[in-house]
Swiss-Prot record:
It catalyses: L-glutamyl-tRNA(Gln) + L-glutamine + ATP + H2O = L-glutaminyl-tRNA(Gln) + L-glutamate + ADP + phosphate + H(+). The active site is at residues 37, 112, 136. The keyword Phosphoprotein does not apply. The keyword ATP-binding applies. Heterotrimer of A, B and C subunits. Its EC number is 6.3.5.7. GO terms for molecular function: ATP binding; glutaminyl-tRNA synthase (glutamine-hydrolyzing) activity. It is an enzyme of class 6 (ligase). Allows the formation of correctly charged Gln-tRNA(Gln) through the transamidation of misacylated Glu-tRNA(Gln) in organisms which lack glutaminyl-tRNA synthetase. The reaction takes place in the presence of glutamine and ATP through an activated gamma-phospho-Glu-tRNA(Gln). The gene is gatA. GO terms for biological process: translation. This is Glutamyl-tRNA(Gln) amidotransferase subunit A. GO terms for cellular component: glutamyl-tRNA(Gln) amidotransferase complex.
Length: 431
């Protein structure tokens, strides 16, 4: 075993926990420094989901992806900051304070995997692991100017991921370039018997830049209302670059986009209200002295342990699942979700990948979006891929006012290789 010391100048607050001295072995990632999002279990290292309620929780086991990384020789150097339990788009909803965008400390890095993106963008680590429930890898990748992949649902084991919304979230890689991302992905993808949703589809692929004959779907909805015209123009130029390399752009539509955001928030909050019911604040988190009933004590522990946004989403989800509202909200959300899947299936009969902006705008200022509904709207372009379970990637494609813009590429089920090749081709074409 070899040793590595890690004392980063973390001026952007990318990390919650760092490991000063790391041991690592031989393998395809030998000595590669990797940061891990703090909702992914690491044996012997505090894992808090950036929440007070898990303060002091030290997992007795590693998540499957962490085991794979260690077996590949990676040096896991710390746990990164995030929006509490993955609920946010800015990494401002953390019990440990916000992470700053390395490119402009007055702006957010995106979320919820903002710490992972910031650590990579700031050059503190070679690559990072995040999780993506509705854009939580792709959003910070776009805002920080790095590459981030949400794999096809089931292609990476979720064993050891502290769940927020099981049917939506997926662990994925983040890196400064496509080749490094591909190397990391080749290690973490594959079957795991401990995750019932895991699929035996390992990733053993080296990116290629030949995209001759590739058909790129360009949905009208990705360039419509709510999208900054400057962002739209930068992304269209990126698609032009891909066309100059032999691809063909094909206009298309995703009519179900108008339902996607509502369906997503009903689904994810419903699943969160169930998943987070187990956190009682008794074993970990802040001590709340009370002589009241167990019911009151449980309520006070959770109020003290959970942040405002987490409490809001638990309440929303509980409401959606209530007997009198289940059909009105949750069942309708699942119908809309199927419509999104159907739209992707229809489009992918005629095209190979879908391209558009990752985010409607560039990274906004810290504290700028205090209205929750306004914040939720920024997920409009990323949630459809999670609802459908298809792979999606963000790659930097230009800048506006010195801040990066992300090109989002979405692929067919289990055709992660194709969107990675497309991103690699674009990266090489711009170089």
């Amino acid at each position: 075993m070899k040793k590595l010391t890690f004392h980063p100048d973390d001026s952007v607050h990318a990390f919650i926990t760092t490991i000063p001295e790391v041991t690592y072995g031989d393998g395809p990632l030998s000595g590669v420094t990797v940061a891990v999002k703090d909702n992914i279990s690491t044996k012997g290292i505090e894992t808090t989901c950036a929440s007070k309620i898990l303060k002091g929780y030290i997992p007795p086991y590693d998540a499957h992806v962490v085991t794979l990384l260690k077996n590949a020789g990676a040096a896991i150097v710390g746990k990164t900051n995030m929006d509490e339990f993955g609920m946010g788009t800015t990494t401002e909803n953390s019990a440990y304070g916000p992470t700053l965008n390395p490119l402009d400390h007055q702006r957010v890095p995106g979320g919820s995997s903002g710490g992972s993106a910031a650590a990579v963008a700031a050059g503190l680590v070679d690559c990072a692991i995040g999780s993506d429930t509705g854009g939580s890898i792709r959003c910070p990748a776009a805002f920080c100017g790095i590459v981030g992949l949400k794999p096809t649902y089931g292609r990476v084991s979720r064993f050891g991921l502290i769940a927020y919304a099981n049917s939506l979230e997926q662990i994925g890689p983040m890196a400064r370039d496509v080749q490094t991302l591909s190397n990391l992905y080749s290690v973490i993808a594959g079957h795991d018997s401990r995750d019932a949703t895991s699929v035996d589809k390992p990733y053993k692929h080296n990116p290629v830049s030949d995209i001759t004959g590739l058909k790129i779907g360009v949905p009208d909805e990705f360039f419509g209302e709510g999208v900054n015209p400057n962002v739209a123009e930068v992304v269209r130029q990126a698609i032009d670059t891909l066309e100059s390399m032999g691809a063909t752009a094909v206009p298309c539509t995703i009519p179900s986009m108008k339902y996607a955001l509502s369906a997503y928030y009903v689904t994810c909050t419903s699943e969160a209200s169930s998943n987070l019911a187990r956190f009682d604040g008794v074993r970990y988190g802040p001590a709340v002295g009370t002589l009241k009933s167990w019911h009151d004590a449980y309520s006070e522990q959770r109020k003290a342990g959970f942040g405002k946004e987490v409490r809001r989403r638990i309440i929303l989800g509980t409401f959606s699942l209530a007997a009198g509202y289940y059909g009105r909200y949750y069942q309708k959300a699942q119908t809309a979700r199927q419509m999104v899947r159907d739209d992707f299936e229809r489009i992918f009969r005629d095209v190979d990948v879908i391209a558009g902006p990752t985010m409607p705008d560039i990274a906004f200022k810290l504290g700028e979006k205090s209205d929750p509904l306004q914040m939720y709207l920024s997920d409009i372009l990323t949630v459809p891929a999670n609802l459908a379970g298809v792979p999606a990637l963000s790659v930097p494609c230009g800048k506006i006012n010195s801040m990066p813009v992300g090109l989002q590429l979405i692929g067919r089920y289990f055709e992660d290789e194709r969107i990675i090749d497309t991103a690699y081709a674009y990266e090489q074409g711009r170089a």
